[in-house]
């Protein structure tokens, strides 16, 4: 009953999203609240949010498949699948933000070697192929087994994903295939580390090289993006594993490991944030300092103090500290960060547009499209929520057809011997 209600609600949200996207594509950018001065809005916020979730989740998966940290083995599949679907969501958001989304292929045909954006597109394609290939090597045995043991749509879906692979009859051949899969996953994971760093670090670089926006124009910006990605990825894994991944009610060692990782990443992110704000507030140039004042004390002060400081830093650390490994509190800590990171992404994008480049520019013209103010309208919210609903619906359907959540440890061997464990101590 609950499952039926869940899919009904998701389907309704997805339909609303499809309608909103049709309006966006048919009417163009005029349906948004964007202005000539505030040209990036809610869609870009969600774009960097989901790209960060993807990069963070993938980098966590490398702990299992590259660095042999077997205590994280139970989230290996989950990390790869969330990396893939988060990437899809991020690319869809940036696609609808384009003035002419039908021209997206121009970036592939008309390359500009000196353009960060051009290189970023190549990284996205390579990154996507690496994730898909790693998932296939990880899951090909299960795809083949489920293609034989299931019926209907599940059977067809899994048989298609096998790409013709069949499970060997002999145990010796099966072990050889598993060793080969492990070998290829390690190779792909190693290649994926610089690619994932390039994907989200490159996204940060797109902001960091914009000289006209002093708030972004810094060598620290790509680093902030990367650390924030690790925070969001660890938080998403903690949330999903706590509530859906078969975690024990109390004392699950993986929960404690994820909690320790999340706390570590939050600490690094906090250090970078303090450095950024201290330097920014010390700036003697008024219009450059104005952005930081707006974040801290402006009309939307609560996005920073409640969203970033409260939900991303104070609340999760408090919950992890008092949880003593309890599944509910650890899951809520992860959820708090996952939701709060949206506020972090908002703060990264929107405040950069509040300060005119020179005095009087904000009042020189009288037009709703020439304002240094931005608030997403109803269609922007409905298209965003609907698009998220579409991606979550696709992910949920995949979970029904493919065993994404591991209830038991996966079997991976290196030359027939167990891989050594590496532990993170709190």
UniProtKB/Swiss-Prot annotation:
GO terms for molecular function: oxidoreductase activity. Keywords: Cell membrane, Membrane, Oxidoreductase, Transmembrane, Transmembrane helix. It is an enzyme of class 1 (oxidoreductase). The keyword S-adenosyl-L-methionine does not apply. Its EC number is 1.97.1.14. Its main location: membrane. Disulfide bonds: none annotated. The keyword Nucleotidyltransferase does not apply. It holds the Pfam family NrfD. The chain crosses the membrane at residues 5-25, 40-60, 78-98, 119-139, 187-207, 223-243, 261-281, 302-322, 330-350, 385-405. Gene3D superfamilies: Formate dehydrogenase/DMSO reductase domain. It is found in: Cell membrane. It catalyses: selenite + a quinone + H2O = selenate + a quinol. One of its GO terms (cellular component) is plasma membrane. It is a multi-pass membrane protein. It comes from the Bacteria. Belongs to the NrfD family. The complex is composed of three subunits: SrdA, SrdB and SrdC. Component of the respiratory selenate reductase complex, which catalyzes the reduction of selenate to selenite. This subunit probably receives electrons directly from the membrane quinone pool and transfers the electrons to the iron-sulfur clusters of SrdB. May be the membrane anchor protein subunit of the complex. This is Selenate reductase subunit C. It comes from Mesobacillus selenatarsenatis (strain DSM 18680 / JCM 14380 / FERM P-15431 / SF-1).
């Amino acid at each position: 009953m609950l499952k039926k209600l869940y899919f009904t609600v998701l389907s309704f949200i997805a339909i609303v999203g499809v309608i909103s996207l049709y309006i966006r594509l048919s009417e163009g950018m005029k349906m948004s609240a964007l202005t000539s001065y505030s040209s990036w809005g809610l869609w870009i916020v969600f774009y960097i949010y989901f790209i960060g979730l993807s990069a963070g989740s993938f980098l966590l998966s490398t702990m299992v498949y590259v660095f042999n940290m077997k205590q994280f083995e139970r989230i290996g599949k989950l990390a790869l699948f969330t990396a893939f679907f988060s990437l899809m969501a991020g690319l869809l958001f940036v696609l609808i933000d384009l003035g002419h989304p039908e021209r997206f292929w121009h970036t592939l045909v008309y390359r500009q070697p000196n353009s960060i954006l051009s290189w970023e597109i190549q990284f996205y394609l390579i990154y996507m192929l690496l994730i898909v290939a790693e998932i296939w090597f990880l899951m090909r045995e299960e795809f083949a087994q489920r293609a034989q043991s299931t019926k209907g749509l599940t059977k067809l879906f899994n048989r298609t994903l096998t790409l013709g692979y069949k499970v060997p009859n002999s145990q010796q051949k099966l072990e050889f295939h598993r060793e080969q899969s492990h070998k290829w996953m390690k190779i792909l994971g190693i290649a994926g580390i610089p690619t994932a760093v390039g994907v989200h670090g490159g996204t940060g670089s797109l902001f960091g090289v914009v000289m006209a926006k002093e708030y972004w124009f810094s060598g620290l910006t790509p680093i902030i993006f990367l650390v924030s990605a690790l925070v969001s990825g660890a938080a998403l894994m903690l949330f999903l594993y706590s509530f859906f991944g078969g975690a024990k009610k109390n004392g699950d060692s993986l929960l404690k490991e994820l909690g320790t990782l999340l706390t570590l990443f939050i600490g690094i992110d906090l250090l970078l944030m303090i450095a950024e704000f201290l330097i920014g507030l010390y700036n003697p140039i008024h219009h450059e300092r104005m952005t930081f004042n707006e974040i801290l004390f402006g009309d939307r002060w609560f996005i920073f103090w409640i969203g970033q400081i409260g939900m991303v830093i104070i609340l999760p650390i408090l919950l992890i500290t008092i949880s003593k490994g309890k599944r509910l509190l650890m899951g809520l800590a992860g959820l708090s960060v996952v939701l709060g990171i949206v506020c972090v992404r908002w703060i990264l994008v929107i405040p950069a547009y509040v300060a005119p480049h020179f005095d009087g520019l904000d009042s020189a013209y009288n037009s709703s499209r020439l304002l240094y103010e931005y608030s997403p309208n109803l269609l922007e919210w409905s298209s965003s929520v609907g698009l998220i609903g579409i991606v979550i619906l696709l992910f949920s359907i995949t979970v029904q057809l493919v065993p994404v959540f591991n209830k038991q440890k996966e079997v991976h061997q290196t030359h027939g011997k167990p891989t050594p464990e590496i532990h993170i101590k709190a």
